[in-house]
């Protein structure tokens, strides 16, 4: 609440972690799921229920009489196979009956493709979950080739929740600049397909340098200091410049998603109705600087955009460089003005650079 965040709890569906133990004996039998389902229902009542309800009263007694306005509930994390489906269905049935306003999140398993992924997506559609949680921890080449991943997703199916993702990069599992750059490139496709991808969250947020369980992570810390990684800045540049409406942006009459004739360029564009400005994100993943022209077309004849816009440039000469506790600000975005003339921006995007352009209407 202090951060303006909203809750999205993930509840146990009666399956053990299938990575750790895929034996049927480790799972809750179907006819013994009732207590797990009731836990999920009680959680919703605790979060949203009136203080006259059993769990709403508990919440009030704990010092929070106002509801938490829970909107989403995920059932299971990185589960797969028929054993997941037969447990998910009774959860969905019970929640739909008692709390039809809650959006239910299912999962497509631990991978971004493959047998389990291909099995689970049709099942998620059949069961009619609201969102499907996709996870992908992948190397650089995967992110470079996945800028158009969501272009052909079914617009009528469940929405996507990209619930965990990160670019590992060259066998490393920390946040060097090139990994962050390719995450920025991938996110242009996420933003362009906002009608399909409802939410996205990066890999774990916080990790202690001497006590971590998983990497990469967005923020590293020791007992005295903390450091924001390159990936953190990418997330910040997207989160603080997300706009209110997606607008089309093309190169050679195609989406700018690193296609064969686009020289490693990726781009997305939004209109921010709150601040009355256009926001264009451009990522140059190539090894060479590239001249570009951003032309704002289809505007009313009375609209003339001339003057100064803003550009926020995120770049490192060394793709393997990173921010660390000793040099926490080695790589940070830099803001400056850029000329807008005749509804156009003519500029050059540096090699391996992520730029956010902001132009007021």
What does each model-identified segment do?
Residues 2-6, 66, 98, 189-197, ...:
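A structural motif corresponding to the C-terminal end of an alpha-helix
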Residues 15-31:
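Surface-exposed, active-site-proximal loop segments in enzymatic domains
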Residues 14-18, 157-267, 274-276:
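Aromatic/acidic polysaccharide-binding cleft in carbohydrate-active enzymes
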Residues 9-13, 77, 106-108, 201:
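Glycine-rich, histidine-containing beta strand-loop boundary motifs that form or position
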Residues 277-285:
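Short, well-ordered beta-strand segments enriched in hydrophobic/aromatic residues
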Residues 254-262, 284-361:
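C-terminal beta-sandwich/jelly-roll accessory domains of carbohydrate-active enzymes
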């Amino acid at each position: 609440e202090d951060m303006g965040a909203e809750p999205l709890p993930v509840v146990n569906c009666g399956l053990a972690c299938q990575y750790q133990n895929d034996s049927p004996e480790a799972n809750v039998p179907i006819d013994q799921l009732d207590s797990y389902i009731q836990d999920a229902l009680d959680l919703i009542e605790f979060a949203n229920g009136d203080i006259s309800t059993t769990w709403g009263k508990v919440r009030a007694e704990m010092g929070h009489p106002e509801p938490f306005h829970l909107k989403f509930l995920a059932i299971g994390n990185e589960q797969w196979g028929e054993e997941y489906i037969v447990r998910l269905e009774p959860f969905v049935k019970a929640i739909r009956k008692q709390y039809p306003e809650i959006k239910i999140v299912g999962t497509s398993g631990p991978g971004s493709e493959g047998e389990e992924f291909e099995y689970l997506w049709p099942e998620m559609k059949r069961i009619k979950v609201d969102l499907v949680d996709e996870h992908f921890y992948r190397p650089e080449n995967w992110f470079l080739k996945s800028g158009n991943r969501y272009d052909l997703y079914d617009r009528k199916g469940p929405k996507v929740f990209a619930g965990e993702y990160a670019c590992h990069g060259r066998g490393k599992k920390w946040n060097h600049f090139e990994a962050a750059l390719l995450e920025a490139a991938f996110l242009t496709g996420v933003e362009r397909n906002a009608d399909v991808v409802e939410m996205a969250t990066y890999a774990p947020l916080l990790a202690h340098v001497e006590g971590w369980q998983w990497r990469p992570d967005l923020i590293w810390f020791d007992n005295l200091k903390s450091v924001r990684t390159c990936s953190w800045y990418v997330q910040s540049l997207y989160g603080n410049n997300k706009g209110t409406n997606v607008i089309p942006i093309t190169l050679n009459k195609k989406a700018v998603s690193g296609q064969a004739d686009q020289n490693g360029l990726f781009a997305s564009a939004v209109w921010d109705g709150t601040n009355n400005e256009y926001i264009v994100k451009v990522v140059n993943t190539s090894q060479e600087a590239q001249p570009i022209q951003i032309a704002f077309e289809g505007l009313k004849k009375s609209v003339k955009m001339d003057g100064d816009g803003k550009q926020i440039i995120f770049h490192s000469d060394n793709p393997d460089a990173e921010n660390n506790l000793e040099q926490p600000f080695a790589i940070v975005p830099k803001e400056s003005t850029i000329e807008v003339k005749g509804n156009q921006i003519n500029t050059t995007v540096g090699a391996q650079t992520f730029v956010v352009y902001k132009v007021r209407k």
